[in-house]
Swiss-Prot record:
Keywords tagged on the record: Ribonucleoprotein, Ribosomal protein
One Gene Ontology biological process: translation
UniProt similarity note: Belongs to the bacterial ribosomal protein bL27 family.
Classification via InterPro entries: Ribosomal_bL27 (IPR001684), Ribosomal_bL27_CS (IPR018261)
Modification(s) after translation: The N-terminus is cleaved by ribosomal processing cysteine protease Prp.
Pfam families in the cross-refs: Ribosomal_L27
Tagged with keyword Transmembrane helix: no
Listed Gene3D superfamilies: 2.40.50.100
Protein name, entry field: Large ribosomal subunit protein bL27
Top-level taxonomic group: Bacteria
SUPFAM superfamilies: Ribosomal L27 protein-like (SSF110324)
GO MF term set: structural constituent of ribosome
Propeptide: 1-10
Gene source species: Phytoplasma mali (strain AT)
Amino acid sequence: MLLKLNIQLFASKKGVGSTRNGRDSHSKRLGAKISDGQYATAGSIIYRQRGTKIHPGYNVGVGSDYTLFTKINGFIKYTNKKNKKQVSVYENIKKI
């Protein structure tokens, strides 16, 4: 009499499905670097931004990536105009 042999082979490792999570981008570190009323030296970065969220005022330059920087040594002053925010640099804060 012949015996039928029933052999089942199981996986030694469980098949694991991939996940769609697990990635994240580095923070861009945008925003104000110098606050209102603080003293800044020439060339200091005042505000990092995407687009002109804040516009340049007196003695403030704009970089190619819309970064605002000081042109002179002085005090930072943020102001609100009708439809836009603006930042300026003054040598003496009492003149404002």
